[in-house]
């Protein structure tokens, strides 16, 4: 089943990099094959990723915070998730929207924000109200894997 997501977005150019700044609902992030996190396990010689291994305790702390915020209506997560694809995304400059067809684009690589994504996923599994929670997302397009790795290093060391 194809799901197409249409969201308002701002086109951002930074040198050679093209980004779309938008927001996604947690339910969008949970679409099968929507994202992948390429981790590097130092104990696995065949592992070719670049992300640190997931710290489940850190993700759970975020999940607990988001769930608590559903009751008080004050959950706040302003820090964006940085995703990337080596493909292009359709952008409509007339109405400033992007169209994401995950069957043709996906999965997005999570360059920065794997603990936020996992925490949101954990929260949604416990409280379905979280599915409608929106999070800021920056999506880089036409970005090869090696460039994604470089951006991960820049974001996490600069």
Language-model regions: role of each:
Residues 51, 74-79, 83, 87-158:
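Basic- and aromatic-enriched surface patches that contact anionic nucleotides/nucleic acids
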């Amino acid at each position: 089943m194809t799901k197409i997501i249409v969201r308002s977005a701002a086109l951002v150019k930074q040198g050679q990099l093209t980004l779309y700044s938008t927001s996604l609902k947690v339910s969008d992030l949970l679409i099968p094959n929507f994202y992948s996190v390429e981790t590097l396990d130092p104990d696995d010689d065949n592992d070719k990723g670049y992300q640190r291994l997931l710290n489940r305790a850190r993700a759970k702390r975020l999940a607990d915070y988001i769930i608590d915020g559903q009751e008080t209506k004050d959950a706040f997560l302003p820090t964006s998730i940085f995703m990337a694809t080596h493909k292009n995304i359709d952008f409509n400059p007339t109405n400033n929207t992007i169209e994401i067809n995950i069957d043709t684009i996906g999965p997005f690589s999570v360059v920065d924000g794997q603990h936020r994504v996992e925490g949101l996923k954990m929260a949604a599994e416990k409280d379905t109200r979280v599915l409608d929670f929106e999070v800021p997302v920056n999506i880089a397009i036409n970005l090869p894997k090696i460039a994604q790795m470089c951006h991960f290093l820049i974001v996490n060391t600069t």
